[in-house]
Amino acid sequence: MARQPFMVRIMQQTISKELKAQMRAERLALRDAIPPETRIEKSLAMAEHAGEAVAFDPGTIISGFMPIRSEADIRPLMARFEARGARLCVPAILDRQTIVFRELLRSAPLVATGFGTAGPGQEATVLDPEIMLVPLSAFDDRGHRIGYGAGHYDRAIGRLRQKGMHPKLMGIAFDCQEVAHVPDEPHDISLDAILTESGLRFFASWIG
């Protein structure tokens, strides 16, 4: 009997992982089905929704990402943030466990940074973002998210929190990636906001 709670937790975690994997596959398939020209239009709409709506002071460090596969292209949004004084950075994958955020400068060339991504090279300054634009597979209206399965962002956020930092997390997705309910566990890291082509939604934690 003493083992039952432990076994129940293991079963619940297994079911949760299976559900997340199914949702991830389904929502990414929907994202992949968006025609390229439509994806561009939706990405530009995101820049319009959030370009001025996100409050930050000049010098604030904001991490974005260079789009791969069928991700939204947030480069227009990042350009708007830069014009307002943000310091931009993008992730570089060091290994299967670790990403760092390298400063993105217009004058710096981009190089391959792992898993099909591109960004500044090793000579770039490594920054700790205060606002993070986070790609994802699926999300719900509570701010719970499903990533790509590698856990890179979760570990990066964990390292920032160990430093005493609490970056604001803004999920980047298309409307088709929303689900009714993401199975969540106590250790999961939730979003503070979500940006889609329909608009920008802030959760209470953005202000808190």
Predicted regions and their residues:
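Short glycine-rich anion-binding loops that position phosphate/pyrophosphate groups of nucleotides
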Residues: 67-70, 137-141
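N-terminal active-site beta-alpha-beta segment that forms phosphate/nucleotide-binding
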Residues: 6-128
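Surface-exposed, charge/polar-rich loops and edge strands
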Residues: 2-18, 22, 32-33, 123-132, ...
